[in-house]
């Protein structure tokens, strides 16, 4: 599980930062990629990475401001032109379906793959045997959501060596033991499957704030997260601007990470007013003063989400 930041700027593209998009690479887990937001030229950014558009399985949109959605029509079309056939699912606020349908219809873009669009509300928006994704409303002046991606715990590996030492040969019984079931062998022995499993691997958690003011809602969304990706449009000294424009500061994002018990904070959605090495170092220092394990994201930065 890796995060790849495709765009880390705020509002409009800049020379060093494109507008918002983050890829959650789940290549080992499910051979796919999930995108969180898709600002203008996201597909251009993807060209500079190893991501294949046909591997993009899901796109989660936080809100409908242009710097988070203008990249969708182009990416959807290119995915089709490049021979993508795998289904793609998009999640987002009310209006996302009309935006996509209108864009595709007006431009006569025909997709070669199934596209499903879910207009979401708070709560669970996706769940399968591997992951659960929940959405929470955040404070941004328009309908906006943050997302929490929680990997389910992975059952412990079967201790096949111990079973063989006990003269239990491989076969269908191994599957039952692997499920933790209690089984009775042909010779009358009773085996508790849980006694032959390694400890389970704890699932990882990644939270995305989307654009938002500092909020207890985000704190809960990021509770015990391995990585919190939080917007930090403004510096500490510009807290009034952040409030007026429904954004957060570096310090506020760090306070959220600390209260949530997150393990790592990645700051993104950085205003173009802070350009150059020195201003960015200052922003990072402001966050680190509150939450040490903080880092300012830059375009194409990759972060491995480690297991606890």
From Swiss-Prot:
Its EC number is 3.1.26.11. Keywords: Endonuclease, Hydrolase, Metal-binding, Nuclease, tRNA processing, Zinc. Zn(2+) 1 binds at residues 63, 65, 140, 211. Binds 2 Zn(2+) ions. It holds the Pfam family Lactamase_B_2. Gene3D superfamilies: Ribonuclease Z/Hydroxyacylglutathione hydrolase-like (3.60.15.10). It comes from the Bacteria. The keyword Zinc applies. One of its GO terms (molecular function) is zinc ion binding. It catalyses: Endonucleolytic cleavage of RNA, removing extra 3' nucleotides from tRNA precursor, generating 3' termini of tRNAs. A 3'-hydroxy group is left at the tRNA terminus and a 5'-phosphoryl group is left at the trailer molecule. It is an enzyme of class 3 (hydrolase). Belongs to the RNase Z family. PANTHER family: ZINC PHOSPHODIESTERASE ELAC PROTEIN 1 (PTHR46018:SF2). Zinc phosphodiesterase, which displays some tRNA 3'-processing endonuclease activity. Probably involved in tRNA maturation, by removing a 3'-trailer from precursor tRNA. Homodimer. This is Ribonuclease Z. The gene is rnz.
């Amino acid at each position: 599980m890796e995060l790849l930041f495709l765009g880390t700027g705020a509002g409009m593209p800049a020379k060093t930062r494109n507008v918002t998009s983050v890829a959650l690479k789940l290549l080992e887990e499910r051979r796919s990629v999930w995108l969180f937001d898709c600002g203008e030229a996201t597909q251009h950014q993807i060209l500079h990475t190893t991501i294949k558009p046909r591997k993009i399985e899901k796109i989660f949109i936080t809100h409908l401001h242009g710097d988070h959605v203008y990249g969708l029509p182009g990416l959807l079309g290119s995915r089709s032109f490049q021979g993508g056939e795998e289904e793609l699912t998009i999640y987002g606020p009310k209006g996302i379906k009309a935006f996509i349908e209108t864009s595709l219809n007006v431009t006569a873009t025909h997709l070669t793959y199934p596209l499903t669009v879910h207009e979401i509300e708070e709560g669970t928006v996706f769940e399968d045997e591997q992951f659960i994704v929940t959405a929470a409303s955040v404070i941004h002046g328009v309908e906006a959501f943050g997302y929490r991606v929680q990997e389910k715990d992975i059952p412990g590996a079967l201790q096949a060596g111990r079973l063989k030492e006990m003269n239990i040969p491989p076969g269908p019984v191994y599957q039952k033991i692997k499920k933790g079931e209690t089984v009775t062998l042909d010779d009358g022995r009773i085996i508790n499957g849980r006694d032959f499993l390694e400890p389970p691997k704890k699932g990882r958690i990644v939270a995305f704030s989307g654009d938002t003011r500092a909020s207890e809602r985000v704190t809960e969304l990021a509770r015990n997260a391995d990585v919190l990706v939080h917007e930090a449009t403004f510096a500490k000294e510009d807290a009034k601007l952040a409030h007026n424009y429904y954004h957060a500061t570096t310090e506020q994002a760090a306070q959220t990470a600390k209260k949530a018990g997150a393990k790592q904070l990645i700051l993104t959605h950085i205003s173009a007013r802070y350009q150059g090495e020195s201003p960015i170092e200052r922003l990072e220092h402001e966050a680190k003063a509150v939450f040490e394990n903080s880092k300012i994201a830059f375009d194409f930065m990759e972060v491995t989400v480690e297991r606890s």
